[in-house]
Curated annotation (Swiss-Prot):
GO-annotated molecular function: 2-oxoglutarate-dependent dioxygenase activity; metal ion binding; peptidyl-lysine 4-dioxygenase activity
Cofactor: Fe(2+)
Name of the featured protein: 2-oxoglutarate and iron-dependent oxygenase JMJD4
Organism whose genome encodes this protein: Mus musculus (Mouse)
Keyword Cytoplasm: yes
Length: 427
């Protein structure tokens, strides 16, 4: 990030009415921008045109032309190279969802060896895309986290546009998880209607095959809720024509449809609900990521999640000792993170950015790997962290969290960030 882009981004957030927005974007677009040429599209262009206004876009296959996975995982006919994949990753244990079975608003999963999944996939194709085992979709395979393969860095090259990735930076520090996934499945596999975890951004690249995306801008999903307040499993279902079951359906807008070709890269903004279909035999690489641009959306989402938990167990509020603590425990189980872990997430990123800024102000470049996007990015990140942490520390539910063992204390960390924001004005 350069100084001009940082200034632009900081002004953008100052001009917002609510310093911690509830998670929308700009005006609803009529279509999605297609970005053709890598050399003609900068990181600053992406920040200003898509990241800040929270709008989707599609990058051409030229952006992923050098990826090893596009050379090795795919045959000359553009199909999955089953023989190579089975030889390379056959022993890996992978999660597989049955797209033909609904379990709440998702699909039931099982685990099998990648070798067995490839065998199923080949049989499925030979059976005219049908099987008594159902329509199985390999989803959420943590290849980067789990693989013992030595050449993982050649599978893909992280595009600079997505390199400010706090979510995976945090989990890499803990060395226990990540949000980098491989998806693979035959024609007809699909993902039900959803918004991405923690209201993260995501990006998705088709290594081979073709996808159809149905996008709904933030807020549009409200018209799709049924009379009980639940979102649909499948937005194309004729069930949605029942106005008694879906009383707001007449107010809904048509989705924005995107066809993603082989090699193309889709940017999914924060809070955009979507439904995705594989139109061909398809393999994709997908990342979820959070940074200073959607951190407020993540914080807003976590507050909503806690409120939902509190509503469900409201009747035990007066009789259950440590009711607020139990709500945090339930939230952690259901959402994957609670307020305590969110503070730890903020702290890890904040301390790394404060170190980069301290080194920069001293004229010491330090470890160049500490932040690929540079000193101005660190300064911008610190400002966003300060804004959100200021909201966190005054939140009544966070104030009920036992922070006695936190180091530094939240108020102390906030002061460090605010001091750093002031110091960064000179950069």
């Amino acid at each position: 990030m350069d100084r001009e882009t940082r200034t632009f981004a900081e002004r953008y957030y100052r001009d917002l009415r609510d310093p911690v927005p509830s998670g929308g974007g700009g005006p609803t677009p009529s279509g999605v921008t297609f970005i053709q040429t890598p050399n003609a599209f900068s990181y600053a262009d992406f920040v200003k045109g898509f990241l800040l206004p929270n709008l989707p876009c599609v990058f051409s296959s030229a952006f992923t032309e050098g990826w090893g996975s596009r050379r090795r995982w795919v045959t000359s006919e553009g199909k999955p190279d089953f023989e190579y994949l089975q030889q390379k990753y056959g022993d890996a244990v992978v999660p597989v969802a049955n797209c033909g079975v609904r379990e709440y608003n998702s699909n039931p999963k099982e685990h099998m060896s990648f070798r067995d999944y490839i065998s199923y996939w080949k049989d499925y194709i030979q059976g005219s895309y049908s099987s008594s085992r159902g329509c199985l979709y390999l989803k959420d395979w943590h290849l980067c986290r789990d693989s013992l393969v030595n050449d993982l860095e050649d599978i893909f090259t992280l595009p600079v546009y997505f390199s400010s990735d706090w979510l995976n930076e945090f989990w890499d520090v803990l060395n226990v998880d990540d949000y980098r996934f491989v998806y693979a499945g035959p024609r007809g596999t699909w993902s039900p209607f959803h918004a991405d975890i923690f209201r993260s951004f995501s990006w998705s690249v088709n290594i081979c095959g073709k996808k159809k995306w149905l996008f709904f801008p933030p807020g549009e999903e409200e018209a799709l809720r049924d009379c009980h307040g639940n979102l649909p499993y499948d937005v194309t279902s004729t069930e949605l024509l029942d106005t008694h079951l879906y009383p707001k359906i007449q107010h809904h807008s048509l989705p924005i449809e995107v066809i993603q070709e082989p090699g193309e890269m889709v940017f999914v903004p924060s809070g955009w609900h979507h439904q995705v279909y594989n139109l061909d035999d398809t393999i994709s690489i997908n990342h979820n990521w959070v940074n200073g641009c959607n951190l407020p959306n993540m914080w807003h989402f976590l507050q909503q999640e806690l409120q939902a938990v509190q509503h469900e167990v409201e009747e035990w509020k007066d009789s259950m000792p440590d009711w607020h603590h139990h709500c945090q425990v339930i939230m952690k189980s259901c959402t994957g993170i609670n307020f305590e872990e969110f503070y730890h997430f903020l702290k890890v990123i904040a301390e790394k950015r404060l170190l980069v800024l301290e080194q920069g102000l001293k004229g010491d470049s330090g470890d160049s790997r500490s932040l690929d996007l540079g000193l101005q990015q660190a300064a911008f990140d610190i400002g966003r962290l300060a804004d959100v942490l200021a909201s966190v520390v005054v939140n009544p539910d966070f104030q009920r969290v036992d922070t006695s063992a936190f180091s530094p204390q939240p108020e102390e960390l906030l002061q460090q960030l605010e001091d750093a924001v002031a110091a960064a004005e000179a950069l």
